[in-house]
């Protein structure tokens, strides 16, 4: 017996029982997103490949987490859902070939380092889609991501921890060093 690719369906309580989830949530805010740059890059990549993405116009809650207006939603109710799902789902187990020329790349959120949530419950998707704006094309996404900015939370004139989560965070450290500021590294705790 030879197994080629194993991909479970979403069979949990309230889930759709399908190969595809209902949508993916990709936060575009600092509270819910570790790497805003990579999330914005993903929005650009998806729309460049004709995947439709939406941005929420109001806050919503999923699985106990509040997401603000401006959160990216990638619905699976579209012609390019296989493109989106191929890039975003959590991977395929291929165990039928002993040698592969190359591994397939999936789980872009893991390889590129951005936070993402999979939604497989139709009832949850119904409430999420109700707060979404119109689908964005690539030009819309470029304009939207260009307007995204970093932000600071915390006490001014105190020590700040910058997570090494993106090219932008590295660039920020380099700018601090060029300006003669003291920069240290947390090695434990």
For every predicted segment, state its role.
Residues 1-3, 7-189:
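Intrinsic-disorder/low-complexity accessory segments
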